[in-house]
Amino acid sequence: MYGFLKDKNMSRIGKKPIIVPQNVTANIDGNKIEIKGPNGLREFLTSKEVEVKLEENQIVVKPKNLSKKSRQHWGMNRTQIANLIEGVTTGFTKNLELNGVGYRAALQGNILKLSLGYSHEVNFEIPKDVKITVPKPTEISINGIDQQIVGQVAANIREKRKPEPYKGKGIRYRDEYVFAKEGKKK
């Protein structure tokens, strides 16, 4: 199909068409893509190096020419469009855990209040594009339709008190493993 792809190290993710579910509508106007689904509406500008077409219930991304830059943008743009569709259908979630004595989280309106062992409470203002829930005082769940924003908000909250390597106290992702160091020995 694409004979110019001779490099064995290159990903071929761009070749895969993106299937558009029944409950999602996709509009393509030049290099602007608009995806609307049950969770909301997302827009995306693709690179000028790729060509995007809507064929029946599939979105196909192709490079415009044989240049290295076109091939680099090909797979990236295909993945970003697939993430748009996933975001408006199921959404993205990041879960954080608070480990430490007295470490707590609580929601108060549009503010996430964190007790992290400092002499004061840390207040985190929740952006309008994400929804934060606190199922337990030591757990935080961040949900949204934009993977980049959800990940950035989770990273910003984690930055308030990163897990330290000796006792593991701090805020960590649920699936994160903190490598424990040994203390000093006499």
Predicted regions located by residue number:
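Ribosome-associated RNA-binding proteins
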Residues: Y2-K186
